[in-house]
């Protein structure tokens, strides 16, 4: 009789432990899914912004004219 009571307590302990692990795993899975969706949303938004705000390329760097070369000492 004592053994059956101990077994039921042990089963309750393990089922509680399994429930805790299951809920923890489910919570982590949901958090991961939310973060992944936010990541995709931000990536698409930045891609959209880069297309709409397409800036012209910067001007080429200025070159030194040949007249200034006389000031250089060889």
Curated annotation (Swiss-Prot):
Localization (cell): Host membrane
Its membrane topology: Single-pass membrane protein
UniProtKB keywords: Host membrane, Membrane, Transmembrane, Transmembrane helix
A cellular component term, taken from the record's GO annotations: host cell membrane
Keyword Membrane (UniProt): yes
Major location (coarse): host cell
Signal sequence extent: none
Residue stretches spanning the membrane: 20-40
Origin superkingdom: Viruses
Other observations noted: Encoded wby inverted terminal repeats (ITR).
UniProt record similarity statement: Belongs to the asfivirus KP93L family.
Name of protein: Uncharacterized membrane protein KP93L
């Amino acid at each position: 009789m004592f053994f059956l009571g101990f077994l039921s307590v042990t089963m309750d302990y393990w089922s509680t432990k399994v429930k805790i692990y299951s809920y923890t795993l489910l919570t982590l899975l949901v958090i991961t899914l939310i973060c992944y969706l936010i990541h995709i949303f931000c990536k698409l938004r930045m891609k959209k912004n880069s297309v709409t705000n397409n800036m012209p390329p910067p001007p080429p760097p200025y070159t030194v004219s040949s007249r200034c070369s006389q000031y250089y000492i060889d």
